[in-house]
Amino acid sequence: MKSRSDASESIAAFPKNSDICDMEVFFAHEADGRFCRLDADESGHCCRVLRHRAGDKINVIDGIGTMYRCRLVDDNPKGAEAEVLETFPGWGGHPYRLTVACCPTKNNDRFEWFVEKATEVGVDRIVPLIGDRSERKVYKTDRALRIALSATKQSLKARIPQIDEPVSAKDFLRHSETAEQAKESLKLIAYCFEGDTKRISIQEALRAYGGRDITVLIGPEGDFSPEEARLAVNQGYIPVHLGSSRLRTETAAVIATTAVYLRYE
């Protein structure tokens, strides 16, 4: 994966009179390195709403890490096509790989807010967990995927985070590598452990880690069950706290994402 400095060099390569704050980005459902093709939604926004015409230069992402500087050759609002002029691999990327496994909130809007903000900050994979104490036992990812795409474009990134289908917390943990198997990764669980279990701050855990592969577990409104917490620790997850405030699930997930982002800035 490209580093943030690589991404900065890519952005700097644009013409000096372009204003990155007002930069428009479109998503290509098909990109082969020579041409980018937009689906009906993106084409309509590009050609009907923003009134781009053949010959205009546009910026297109492929959703898997590359941004293309293109010239529009077909301004059909139902299926636009653009010729690739320049390629910027790793555009808007970050020098870490972050998975946030988080229990969806009872209120869908709150979890979708997390998806949006985590995407803007920098997350690679979101896993909706169904915990023993989850109030929401079913979660559909369709809308979250659309929100992630919009946030990816808004935050000037080229890679859309992967959003998994929901899985039970215990199944996710059982299939998680043990600490011995995954020495290169850092696995953290934010949980209000009782008794003598020691928790360190997430900042301390990140400072002590020299790698780039991180997974963070965030529980539901009622937190993980003791059984889930024990299973996580047995699988090599380090107990951490996110500060002294009591946080909503979605707030905790965004703070954890931000802590990782700032660690590698």
Protein language model features and the residues they cover:
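N-terminal positively charged helical leader segments and presequences
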Residues: 1-90
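N-terminal-biased segments
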Residues: 48-81, 170-206
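Generic structural signal for residues in well-ordered beta-strands
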Residues: 82, 160-164, 239
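Short, ordered loop/turn segments at secondary-structure junctions
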Residues: 87, 131-134, 221, 244-245
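RNA substrate-binding interface of SAM-dependent RNA methyltransferases
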Residues: 89-189
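Active-site/ligand-binding-proximal alpha/beta "capping" segment
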Residues: 187-230, 237-242
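Structured adenosyl-cofactor binding patch, chiefly the S-adenosyl-L-methionine
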Residues: 226-265
